[in-house]
């Protein structure tokens, strides 16, 4: 199991991205992932690629439908070339409200649209590598023009691993059919991964005559830890609040269903609509907390991760942002406990 680092998005993180990439690589992390919330997911990786040599660099979630496949293809191509083959493209759909109201882009049949988006990416990359014509015509996307002036040309590592980030079974099936990896949402349990995610990926792989082991499973894990009891208690309540937020969202009710906790989701959803944010964490019991998070001392996090994910997850990051010069001793201890 690989241990990765997740990049935070607070403060002036972009200005220190070169230092962050070197620090993550020096500590022994296998990969460094960006997400797309307050900032662009790709730009930090260009800086990281120039500052590092071995660590894998990827977008855990870059929003697909806010961009044309051509735009994503070009950016990914350049990052793959710049990093000498270390780039991993992770895509997500987001939800309808954000795509239509924040990005002002179309939304319909997201799984079918994402499937075609992936096929379009690979057609574009094929045109880049062969310097041949581009002929992709689908239901949602049409790319039929590529002249030498606009073609970046072949690169040394043209095979770009593509992951999908998702929660429900349709996207997991799509990953099994077409992709090299699937990012399991941080709000999960081993039981949910075992009973819902893996069978869906296996079904998608079966339909495409692929093997399940061709698909890497990655995730971020909620972790309750600390150098003392006070810090651990503080983190426990923080994780409890985060879980209550995710559990209130209907999109994630399938995770609760794996444990027979559907009523908890409905109750939290009602409280969220009533803006009872401060009262919501109390609904998450210690049993639920144990299902969705691990609790361990820093030097025991590695064994706890292996016990939880062995045979289920191939690579994992902690649901904590990695920032150099902040908690360096903690991160060194965690990496050593895993490796």
Feature-to-residue mapping (PLM):
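Active-site-adjacent structural elements that line small-molecule/cofactor binding pockets in enzymes
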Residues: 1-339
């Amino acid at each position: 199991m690989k241990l990765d680092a997740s990049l935070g998005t607070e403060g002036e993180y972009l200005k220190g991205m070169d230092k962050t990439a070197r620090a993550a690589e020096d500590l022994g992390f296998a990969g460094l992932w960006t997400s797309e919330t307050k900032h662009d997911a790709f730009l930090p990786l260009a800086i990281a690629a120039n500052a590092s040599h071995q660590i894998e660099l990827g977008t855990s979630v870059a929003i697909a439908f806010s961009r044309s496949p051509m735009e994503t293809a070009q950016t990914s191509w350049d990052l793959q070339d710049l990093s000498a083959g270390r780039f991993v493209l992770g895509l997500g759909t987001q939800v309808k409200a954000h795509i239509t109201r924040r990005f002002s882009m179309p939304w319909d049949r997201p799984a079918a649209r994402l499937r075609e988006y992936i096929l379009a990416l690979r057609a574009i990359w094929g045109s880049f590598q062969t310097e041949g014509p581009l002929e992709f015509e689908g239901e949602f996307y049409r790319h039929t023009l590529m002249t030498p002036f606009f073609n970046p040309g072949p690169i040394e590592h043209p095979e770009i691993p593509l992951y999908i980030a998702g929660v429900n079974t349709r996207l997991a099936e799509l990953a099994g059919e077409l992709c090299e990896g699937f990012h399991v949402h941080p709000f999960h349990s081993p039981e949910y991964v075992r009973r819902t995610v893996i069978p869906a990926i296996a079904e998608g792989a079966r339909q495409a005559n692929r093997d399940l082991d061709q698909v890497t499973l990655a995730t971020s894990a909620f972790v309750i830890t600390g150098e003392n009891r006070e810090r651990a208690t503080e983190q426990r309540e923080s994780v409890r609040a985060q879980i209550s937020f995710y559990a209130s969202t209907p999109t994630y009710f399938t995770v609760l269903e794996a444990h027979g906790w559907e009523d908890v989701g409905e109750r939290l959803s009602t409280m969220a609509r009533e803006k009872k944010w401060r009262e919501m964490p109390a609904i998450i019991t210690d049993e639920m907390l144990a299902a969705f998070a691990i609790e361990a001392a820093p030097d025991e996090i590695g064994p706890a991760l292996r016990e939880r994910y062995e045979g289920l997850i191939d690579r994992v990051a902690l649901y904590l942002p990695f920032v150099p010069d902040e908690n360096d001793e903690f991160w060194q201890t965690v990496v050593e406990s895993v490796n």
